[in-house]
Amino acid sequence: IMKDQLLKALVLNEHVRLYIVRTTDLVQEAQDRFDLHPCACAALGRTLSVASMMGAMLKSEEEMLSITINGHGPIGSIVVDAYANGNVCGFVSNPHVEDVLIRPGKLNVGAVVGTDGTLTVTKDLSMEENFSGSVELQSGEIGDDFAYYFTLSEQTPTAVSCGVLIGTDGRVASAGAMILQMLP
């Protein structure tokens, strides 16, 4: 049985930082705990997956970050906290949001998240003031929005891919994410 894991690497002569995370168990736990409908599960699962990698980017165990995504869509807000040890926790305002499909079998996460709003990351780096960065949502599909956040708010060109596959039985078949970042 595959277990959730996070891998970090420097590639291309240490010019690119790579994070890959498998989060199937984590996302299934969230679905069970909050009785998430598929679109809500995909939205929260993608955010939890990216957040776990962002937590791993923190420098010390005392640091943590909070992510809030609110596109004024039917799902409401997605709120996730991430810690340096890889632990994450989060919730969505409306776990029973009605599913929207792009085509049969393909969830339209952007439609339930919405795009009329922001993605905000607040980092508690154990200093007097927290660092906070906020960007307008690009697609509501989560990955694009985080890529835009890293590029704009942290001035780090970044590619983000994340996904949650809900099986025909309604349970999480697979979940994970990847972050590629250009280093200065």
Which residue stretches match the model-derived regions?
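Interaction interfaces in information-processing and related assembly proteins
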Residues: M2-P184
